[in-house]
Amino acid sequence: MSLRNQLLGAFAYVLLLIIVALEVPLALNLARRIDAEVKNEAASQAFIVAANASGQMGNLAELRKLARSSGRTLGARVIVVGPPPNGRLLADSTVAAPPNTPYASRPEIARALQGFRVQGERHSDTLGQDLLYTAVPVTNNGKVVGVARVTQSLSAVHSRIRRGVLALV
């Protein structure tokens, strides 16, 4: 093998190492950014549902229509829960739970009923998949009158991250 071929091989190897060394941190950063973007988008969606539900908490027909239309638009499950202390289900974009099911004991609902935004990931044994949930308080004149929760599958989030990382490669 000639010296020229050895130098070209060494140059190609060093170039490959440089590309990999730059690509890995970039891919990790991109994955974190996409994850943060998806979570911020979910929070925005939950706040929009809460704002729309604010003046409708006494009108169950309108709340149910809001939950169904929001669920279709967002491709997520949307629920609206009534005021503390009971925190009963008022509207659901699916028919997963009957109306008046108590939700106040669920950690994310209990925290949102205290006025906090709650977001996290958990596994649903019922659905057999991992979920991203976002629960926000529904307020009216500064008082918490309920909770809006948006729940979406994490498989869609993970596939979006995967597509973004693969686009780099």
Summary of predicted features, one role per range:
Residues 28-53, 57, 155, 164-167:
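Juxtamembrane membrane-water interface segments immediately C-terminal to a transmembrane helix
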Residues 63-135:
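Extracytoplasmic ligand-binding sensor domains of the Cache superfamily
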Residues 139, 149-168:
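Helix-start (N-cap) segments at beta->loop->alpha junctions
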Residues 44-48, 65, 114, 159:
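Generic recognition of well-ordered alpha-helical segments
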Residues 33-40, 99-107, 152, 160, ...:
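Residues at secondary-structure transition points
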Residues 1-27, 169:
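Extreme N-terminal signal-anchor transmembrane helix of membrane signaling/transducer proteins, especially
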Residues 144:
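Glycine-rich acetyl-CoA-binding "A-motif" of GNAT/NAT acetyltransferases
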